[in-house]
A protein has these predicted regions:
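Acidic, PIN/NYN-like endoribonuclease modules and their adjacent C-terminal/linker elements
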Residues: 1, 67, 73, 104-135
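Short, well-structured N-terminal submotif of metal-dependent ribonuclease cores
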Residues: 1-36, 50-60, 131-135
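A generic structural signal for short hydrophobic patches within well-formed alpha-helices
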Residues: 9-10, 41, 117-118
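Short, flexible helix/strand-to-coil boundary loops that buttress conserved ligand/catalytic motifs
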Residues: 13-14, 48, 87, 121
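Phosphate- and divalent-cation-binding pockets in alpha/beta enzyme and binding domains
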Residues: 21, 43-44, 82, 119-120
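A short acidic, often aromatic-flanked loop/helix-cap motif at beta-alpha or helix-coil junctions
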Residues: 42, 78-81, 130-135
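Active-site-proximal, substrate-binding regions of enzyme catalytic domains
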Residues: 43-71, 78
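Active-site neighborhoods of divalent-metal-dependent phosphate/nucleic-acid chemistry enzymes
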Residues: 71-113
Length: 135
């Protein structure tokens, strides 16, 4: 089961250099085993709305998240110590520490292009790694 980091969605939304790798991942993945944090959705919402892409944001949430079966996870305030623990132990900023805490709490592998996760116990995988291990 996988927690998809914000930068994976940004690669897709902004059509960056690894967009095809991301598209391949989503077309091949069992989306019932794919998760996103509420923090990622909020971050993506900030980006969409800053660009005045209100309808595009709703389309993304409704079609790419809800209709596809991707699950949304969050942390309650009682679990926020897990964020600060990860930030302190692995020298992560808030968004990475939040993702790490969610992945750790729910037993998920982090799918990310962010090398900061390489400093953690859990590490990370990139979409391309998942293709190689399942061929």
């Amino acid at each position: 089961m996988f927690l998809i980091d914000t930068n994976i969605f940004l690669e897709y939304i902004l059509c960056r250099s690894r967009v095809q790798e991301v598209k391949d991942f989503f077309s091949r993945a069992d989306l019932s085993k794919v998760y996103v944090s509420d923090f990622s959705l909020h971050s993506l919402g900030v980006i969409y709305l800053r660009e005045r892409k209100l309808l595009e944001f709703l389309t993304f949430v409704n079609e790419d998240i809800i209709a596809s079966g991707i699950h949304v996870l969050s942390l309650v305030p009682d679990d926020f110590s897990k964020i600060t623990d990860a930030a302190g132990q692995f020298h992560l900023d808030f968004d990475d520490a939040y993702q790490y805490a969610v992945a750790e709490q729910y037993g998920l592998s982090i799918v990310s292009f962010d090398k900061d996760f390489d400093r953690t116990k859990m590490g990370r995988v990139v979409p391309e790694d998942l293709f190689r291990s399942h061929q």
